[in-house]
Structures are given as structure tokens and as C-alpha cells.
Amino acid sequence: MTNESERGAEPTQGQRYSPAEIEPKWQARWDADTGLYAAEAAGDVSQKDGAKAKFYCLEMLPYPSGQLHMGHVRNYAIGDALARYMWMTGHNVLHPMGWDAFGLPAENAALKNNTPPREWTLGNIAAMRKQMRRMGLSYDWATEITTCLPDYYRWNQWFFLKMYERGLAYRKKSKVNWCPQCQTVLANEQVIGGYCWRHEDTPVEQRDLTQWFLRITQYADELLDGLTTMEGWPEKVRTMQANWIGRSEGAFVEFRVAWEGEADPSAALRDDNKKGDDDREGLGREAGPSTPLRFAQDDNQKNNGAGVITVFTTRVDTIFGATSVQLAPEHPVAKGFAETDERLAGEIEEMIAQQTLAREAGDIGGIEKHGVATGRFAVNPFNGERVPIWIANYILADYGTGAIMSVPAHDERDFEFATKYGLEIRRVVAPNVDEDEAGLRLPYMGEDEGVLVDSGEWTGESCLEAQEKMAAFAKAGGFGTPTVTYRLKDWGVSRQRYWGTPIPMVYCERGHAGVAGGPDVEAGGVVPLPESALPVILPEQVEITQEGGSPLGRVPEFVNTTCPVCGGPARRETDTMDTFVDSSWYFYRYTDAKNDRAPFDSAKANYWFPIDQYIGGVEHAILHLIYSRFWTKVMRDLGLIENSEPAERLFTQGMVIKDGAKMSKSKGNVVSPDDMIAQYGADATRMYALFAAPPDRDLEWQEDGVAGVSRFLARVYRIVTKYARAVRSAGIGEARAATLSAAEGDVLRVLHQTVAKIELDFSGRWHFNTCISSIMILVNAIIDREGAIDAGEVSAPVLSEVFRSLVLLLAPFAPFLAAELWEQMGGEGVVFRTPFPRPDAELAREAEAEIPVQINGKLVTVVTVPAGSDEEAMKAAAMGDEKVQARIAGKTVVKTIVVTGKLVNLVVR
């Protein structure tokens, strides 16, 4: 490890601050010292007595687009400042970097530039790595990972096989999100308002495809419950994930489709209980018995094969108020009706088109509600009542069961639909069973405080009590099941692209009928490859076109293979994995990046995990951040790790904007970090990114601000180099005199106030902007006392303490300048491996305090007292003030209120 003081540089008083000379010099030295940023080995550290506390600091790995942008600079400057501070406070720090290197842009570049994706990607990585080095970022490049290389993606394939063994990876035909511009499938999380997450102007289409899925829903409850313990994650992220998981408790209930001409056996019962439609809307009248009227469900001839409609409801307690059943236009029962009804078929086709347009516009929730009566009826299993079946354009086939029971009196959406089409609105929930219905506005939800009316044997019960009882009743009757549903769907990971991880499955042409002793094989000859066959390597000679389907399917040498079970001919899977697979576990690989026998060594991962501080954008809340939580739980269940969550703390930084908008090439407001570094230096560029705004807020980029920070650093350089020789001569550890001069006391007070402020801000507050502001105040305090220093009023020990501390305080934010000044002052060792200054509370205490004095609550004057004065001293100072004496002359002070260190208030008459 480099010892900066051994370079022997002499102070350079009189020279101007030149980052163009300083920064390349230090980066060359740091590059030559390959172990400079290396963490101590987990096995060595964990066994030592009094071992350093570990600190895993990680910024989200970037996609290698070829150029860093200012958002990257801000993200990495935050992590770098934290990592350097943790080194200086005695931690064993892991601070790695890698590349999320698979993805569509490489294929687009291949089309545009006729450059192979691998060549384009690796070239971009080299360019961005060079930029990161130029920024002076403290990454341990020995742990670097690149997800598009076989030594990484073979473990994606290994995990896929392990999930397949456990039933967590499976294949099915389903309706998927299709981006016509990407020519591939998108996961639900990658559809933003009906548009592709990559192409914000491209509407997403719905297609039926056979895809591979990962069973993330098996972990839905744990993913949701875990959010309550993740106090180190932003509330916004936790809320977004909870909403995305979307847990709903309720029941599945079966409504049998009535055969044509079937009588309504509940009509007489309703007539006995109510006379006329007007009475039906009343409250408080008890209904008759609720014995479920069950009918044979195998009478397919009379039933036209329509069978049963299953609905999911969170309010089974309102089922006596169901006045229709509504189907999505793509529901199988709706399609069955349409086979013999051309009018209905036309309506369904039109509704599907409406839904498609609404999805494309990202406004499926705002679609104008439209429905059509089928002329058919469903039977309410709780009372045998026949209710009309409608097809409605706002019911979605892929949400819930694609069917609802409509209870317009107690659901806003149902109320709107029923009002439009004149459907019956029947009240079955009231605020109080004895309360007059006058003034009750519909729809009325009443789940928390409502009671049931006109609901058979459950009349008079609270809604919450009835929900549990009625769900159990449905289960006992064989027409329902209490259940929990989720908005979260299984993760579709198949992508019809080339530049991704090959899926390690083959399709045997023999289908394996009668193969003895072979592994379990799905119908149709789906066979997992053995681990010995990994990695399945991407072929390099692939024609990238804009045609649909996977490019790998056009490479016979890749597609045609042999079955690992029977040795017969087989075809490889030609889809590749979603690139979010790569980023779901990458941070574990950093702990053991060169392991060729396993994804990582469990002991090393268990030492470093969970990540102590993870840093990245909030836009990843329901993509990367939820997938990585799922992957962590799977790895735990595989016995690879002990932790259940990947990161203890998450910080989501704000965006960098310019001219009021996020930087983008299309807006012409992109600022190049290279240009800023060339003009102002890396220290000024990254320090401005930390200073201009609190890190969790958006930052409005102003080049004048970078210039201002550069001028500040020049002032630091001037004042430190002026006294560097004196500091070098003073050495370290010489005791201060017992009595300090006024100049010494003043500058030490500001110094230790600054140290205390920075220590507080690094303890989780993340107020780097105020850290830097405090350093600026300290520098101003030193410069203000430059004359006193020149006059010898500041002793050598104090001078050494002040200037060495200043440079150490600066080190996390401006590492190049700190290293240069540390060397010039003769500092020992590496500046950011030197212990960070500790605050001295006595020295930080103000010498004097200004105390407002009030008379009858109105400010009269301000008096100065020694810091720490007691009540009597404060009272004496107030009473001795000339303005106070003039105001109270001839009056009586009836009460004196003293707030120690804050205020004196005299009450006079």
C-alpha cells in the first residue's frame, strides 16, 4: 500500500491549484497500488479478537452504455464519500463495482453499427472504467464482475436449474406483454403506464406465448411481511413494493351458470320477505333462511357447457346485494356465449379493442365503462337467486379471475355501472341495523363499522365478523374457498433476444416415452441440462435482425443438440433470460468474484451480508429491488446464505436535472462529466454533486456552481501550501499549551464544531451538503486568522492539528487534493486510511452566548454572557443592561423567566 509521505514531496507555496496536474499524478499512483482499496479477507478478519467492523458499501451497478452521465457521478460520489469515511473510522470496507452488461442496447448497436454485441459492450466497459478511475473512485477492481461473460452467467444458469428442481421455474402458455420495438416480452414490472420501460413512446401489446416463469408468488407473503422489518429502507420504496405485491384477503365463490329457461327458485322467498322493488331497497328487514340452493353442475346439455363462473371478492359479506355477475370480454364463459350469438361476438371484439387502446394509452383504469347483457343468468349460491350475466369492458381477464359479482350499493365502480344501465341497487350493509335509512348515501362501504341487513342468517352481524363466517359457509357448501390473492404475478423471464443468458433447457424430439431411470421430464420432452454442461455459451456468429423471434433460433449450430437423458436429437431453448436475473444476485458474487466452483463461498457471503448501505435510484423499487429480495430468499432456502434480505439500509438519491428537466440527449441538456473534469477537475465535479443539494433531493445542475467549488478548492490549496512547511516541521502529537491564545481558541472551536457536524451527518443523516458547507466555514475561519498565524499567535501544535484535520475532513469529498496536501504536509501513510478526526466537546463549546432579553414578551435587547452561564448570571447580565434599566425604571419586576442558554423574560408592572 502506498505511503504518501515517502514520496518526499516538498511544499509548493506560491503555485496555483492545478487539478490537471494533481489528479493524474495521484490516479497513476493509486492504479499502481492494486491492493489500495482491497478489503481484508473475510476469513482473516472474522477470527481476530477486536476485529474491525465490516462495512459493505455498494452503488447499483451500471449498464455499460459507453459514457457516464451526471446521475452516475452523483450516485458514485455518495458511495465513494461514505466508503472513504468508513475506512478512516476503522472499518473493513468492501466497495466493489461491476457491469450489468446484457441487454437490448447492444443488439440495437449491432444493427446500427454492424458491431457484435460483445465487442460493443466490452469496449463501453473499458471506456466507463477509465472514466471511473479518472473520477478517483475507490473501487476494488479485483472484485469486478461483468454479467455478459460466461464466468458470471453460468451461475445464472445454475440457479435456474436449482429453481427448476424445486418447482420454482416452470413453463406455460400465457398472455404476455410484448414490446413491438424491442421485439420481446416484458415483465409486468417493465410496463409503465401501458408503455415499454425502455421506449416510453411505444405502447405494449398483449400476446399469447409459451414462456418460462419464476414462481416469485411463492414468496409473496414473506416479501410483504419482510417490509415491516426493513427500517433502513425508505418508506416510499416499502410502500411501492407493498402496493405491487397487493395482498388481498377474501374468498373465491362459484356462481353456476343457469341453463336457459331455468326458473328462479329464490323469487318466492324474496316475495315473502319483500313486497315490491321499493321495499327491496329498504334497511332493517330480516331475510328468510339462507340455506344454499345447490344444483347439479354436470348438466352440460341444459347448461350449454357454460359451467361455473368463479369470482374473487374481498367482501363476501355483501353477496346478498349482488345484482349481476360481470365478465371480462376474454373470459371463457363469455366466449362460449359468443359462439352462438353473433351480436355478442361483435360486442366482445369491440370491447377487446377498447381495452387494447386503453392499455396502449396507459389509461386502462380510466376507460369509459361499457357493458352488454348476455341474456343469461348465474345462480347466487347463497340464496339461489338468478342474477343477470353481463360482459363489461372494464373487467380485465388477467386480473383476479376475470369475473366479478357486482354489488352496486356498496362499491363505487359497480354503482356507476348499475346507474348507467338501470340495474338493481340492493342495500345489504347499513351503519346500524336499527338506524333509519334516511340520508344514507350510496355507495356505502361500511366494512369497518357496518352491519348486514337483508342477508339471511347473517343479518345483524358486523361486516368483519360475517366475512369470516360466510367464507367458511361457502367452503362447507362446496361452492367457495377462503383465500388470499396477490397483485404480484409470477416473473416471466423468457426474452426473445440474443444478448442475454441462454436458458439451460432442451426439448427432446423423442419425448422420453418409456425412458427408464431418467430424471423427471415434463410432457413434450422438456429436459434440464446437467450442471456439467454449464455454461451454455452464447454463439458469437449471430445475425441480429429486426425480425420477430429469438435470434438464437436462426443459429443451427446452437439449436441442434443431443438430449442429455437419451442421447437422441434435441433442440435448445432459444429464448434468453430477462436481464434482471443478472442483477438479482450480483452483489453476492462480489464477495468471491473469481470462484469457478460455486457462485460464491457461503462463509464469505455470510461475513459481508447484508449490505450495510445500498445506493441507487427509486425507479428500481419494483424491478431490481423486489427481484433481488426474492432471489436472496431462494438462495437462503438453497442453504447458500443465512440472511433473508440483501441490504440493511437503502438510500435512493435524487435525479440530476438541467433546465428543469431530467438530462437526456433528446432534450439537449446533457452535461458530460469528462468536460467538467477537464475544465474544473474531478474533485470539484464530484464535490459539487454532493454540495448543491441534499442527496435525496433532485439536483439542478449549474456549471457556475462547479466553478465556485473549484475556486473554494483553490483557496484550500493556497492556505494549506502556505503553511505546509510549518506543519511538516511541527510533526504530530506535540501537546498544546495549557492556555490558548484567542486566535487558537477561535480556530480550534470552529474546527471541532466542524468535526462534530460531519460525524453526525455521516451517521445516517446523509447531509453531505452541510458537511461541505461546514468545511467551507472552517476554511474561512482559518483565512480570517491568517494575520494572527503570521504574527505567531498560533502555536506549531495547534497549527498542525488544524491543517492536518482540515485535510482529513476533506478527504472523503476531494480525495485527489487531500492526498496532495497530505503529502506536502508530511502526513504519514495514505490519507484516507488515516484515522478521521474526533470532536472535542470542550474545545467546540462557544466562548460566549448571545441571550435575547424580553420585557413582557417583547424583545428589548440582546446581552452577551460567557457560554454555560447559569440562571443567576444570565439574570444579572439582563438586569445590568442600560436598555433594560431604562424600560423598568419606576416599575416593579414581578417575575423573571430564565431559559438557560436561550432567553430572559422580565414580567413588569
Predicted regions and their residues:
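N-terminal catalytic cores of NTP/NDP-binding nucleotidyl/phosphoryl-transfer enzymes
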Residues: D44-T115, E144-F159, T313-T314, P381-F417, ...
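Helix-rich, typically C-terminal accessory recognition domains appended to large enzymatic cores
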Residues: D100, E165-R166, Y170-N177, R247, ...
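Conserved oxyanion/phosphate-binding beta-strand-loop segments in alpha/beta enzyme cores
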Residues: N3, R7-L58, W87-P96, E119-R129, ...
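Residue patterns forming the tRNA-binding/recognition surfaces of aminoacyl-tRNA synthetases
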Residues: T2-E6, R16, P24-K25, R29-Y37, ...
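Glycine- and acidic
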Residues: R7-Q13, M60-L68, A110, D140-I145, ...
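Alpha-helical recognition segments enriched in aromatics with Gly/Pro capping
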Residues: R376-F382, R386-Y399, G553, V559-P695
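NTP-handling and nucleic-acid-processing catalytic cores
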Residues: Q15-Q27, D31, N156-E262, Q301-A430, ...
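Intrinsic disorder/low-complexity segments
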Residues: M1-A9, R256-V308, H512-A523, A726-A738
